[in-house]
A protein has these predicted regions:
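Conserved, hydrophobic alpha-helical core segments of structured domains
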Residues: 1-104, 113
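Charged substrate- and nucleic-acid-binding regions of tRNA-handling and nucleotidyl-transfer enzymes
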Residues: 95-167
């Protein structure tokens, strides 16, 4: 009942508590535990308000909001198209914030005990590695601004499609 006293604005259900317990059993970091606990909060405004009220660090808030918004999509990642996967990776900022992406995958393990993040991690790593090469090539071809962004997206989609065909 301590949760009701500490967080009266949040209606925690069985799934959030189960994810928190699983996170503790897996010796996950506090940030992952926090995100797992709040993963199925109905309204992300409640998560933002809670984080503001208790002055949670920005990385806690960002991960909790990302997990809340994208966990269902990520759990069915193998069924997504290349475009949907790219949208997910961009939304999670997985190319620039690898640690947060790894925390996101750990939170998914707590939410869905049968989730194996290896495929999604390999997909993101493959895309990240190959995209870095293509960015340099695109810049050498004098792409800039919006043109560079569109060309990069096109290259990433090609890489993702190749990955999906092989896996």
């Amino acid at each position: 009942h301590a949760m009701k006293i500490l967080f009266p604005t949040i209606r925690l259900n069985h799934q959030g508590m189960k994810a928190l317990i699983d996170a503790a059993k897996q010796n996950q970091t506090n940030i992952v535990r926090f995100a797992a606990l709040l993963h199925d909060t109905v309204d992300e405004k409640i998560i933002s308000a809670l984080c503001n009220q208790y002055r949670a660090p920005n990385d806690y808030s960002a991960l909790a909001l990302s997990v809340n918004k994208y966990y269902q999509t990520a759990l069915k990642a193998k069924q997504l198209s290349a475009d949907e996967l790219l949208t997910l990776f961009l939304a999670l900022d997985s190319f620039r914030r690898d640690e947060r992406f790894q925390d996101f995958l750990q939170a998914l393990k707590c939410i869905a005990s049968d989730f194996d993040g290896t495929w999604l991690k390999n997909c993101a790593n493959n895309l990240k590695t190959l995209s870095a090469i293509h960015v340099k090539e695109l810049i050498q071809q004098n792409y800039t601004g919006i043109e560079l962004a569109h060309a990069l997206k096109k290259q990433r989609l090609l890489i993702l499609n190749e990955f999906l065909q092989k896996n």
